[in-house]
Amino acid sequence: KWKGVCESNFTNKCNNKLIGARSYQLGNGSPIDDDGHGTHTASTAAGAFVNGANVYGNANGTAAGVAPFAHIAIYKVCSLDGGCSDSDTLAAIDAAIDDGVDILSLSLGASPIPFYEDSIALGAYSATERGIFVSCATGNSGPIIASAGNAAPWILTVGASTLDRKIVATVKLGNREEFEGESAYRPKIPNSTFFTLFDASENATDVFETPYCAPGSLTDPAIKGKIVLCLSGGGVPNVDKGQTVKDAGGVGMIIINSPRYGVTKSADAHVLPAVDVSAADGTKILAYTNSTTNPVATITFQGTIIGDKN
């Protein structure tokens, strides 16, 4: 049944798990994943069992995708800057149909548009007509009000969800307030020392980069020995923010999430003590920082907690 191939420049990467690899990515010519998104979503769909999977010893257990024994064929349609052309998307879906896939999983999309203008909806319709099951992501954001993308009735539309596992870190302020966040950082030796807080937004030299702790943007020597408050986003991955803080002499970091992500927090493998907090809690931390001449805080790490329904 399977008629697909691995492109000639990728044949040594294919095996009994990864049986197909093609690139339609704006003429790039290589199926290799440029930023990790494709690898991540492929492992979610069909990753094999991996015993002892963990991040710095956190969340230790057996990792697996939804269909761990399934074969995978990869069709790369997006560029590193996030561009995914309609022509590439349709060409990849057509190729997958011809190759004989059983299921199409697409973790990409945009704001809703009429079905007759939507390349994913059109391609998915053709696949469904040929007996192929099509599953598409509809985004990760919330709790803002919006219309779901990839909502054609012939598509299984899948939204982001949560689980009852957290990798908990707690911010303790000098006024004794505490705020729960998340972080995959795991200190070798617990440290409950209080350090002075430094707000990157209030001390910005570049309003488009400094608040987000973009690489090279933290030039104030006063950062040395302090915990830096950084805003999430700005096109800067969370771990890169931490590296920027570390390079500037900071000893820790608190990332304040965007309001559009609600209570969602990210547990990242940071390079220094760091924690991700919600926008609501971040607002309270900022209020404390601005209310005193010597705002201080410490970050403690509780590790993996199972069974948390919040």
Description of each model-found segment:
Residues 1-310:
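Loop-rich non-cytosolic ectodomains and luminal regions
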